[in-house]
């Protein structure tokens, strides 16, 4: 009985991890393909054209560096994994060790 409970618990959290990884991979692919945007709070330095008499600033578009974008998705994936592992360990302790 106990072994079956532990196996079910493991299967539940393994599936949740796989689902979270698939969601993160899909989001990464969508951002890379331009189907979705990754919104961050950013400030761009304005570039003033010397010939512009109206005083309108032309701001460069903010964009994450490729390495920063990869790091973001790696961090997101690791946070999801850590959270699922922690929740699984807590549930295991509650259901199996504290009975």
Swiss-Prot record:
Keywords recorded for this protein, A-Z: Antimicrobial, Bacteriolytic enzyme, Hydrolase, Protease
Other remarks on this protein: Encoded in the Rac prophage.
EC class (word): hydrolase
Organism for this UniProt entry: Escherichia coli (strain K12)
Lineage of source species: Bacteria, Pseudomonadati, Pseudomonadota, Gammaproteobacteria, Enterobacterales
Molecular functions (GO terms): peptidase activity
Underlying gene: rzpR
Keyword flag Hydrolase: yes
BP terms from Gene Ontology: defense response to bacterium; proteolysis; viral release from host cell by cytolysis
Domain of life: Bacteria
Enzyme nomenclature, EC number: 3.4.-.-
Descriptive protein name: Putative endopeptidase RzpR
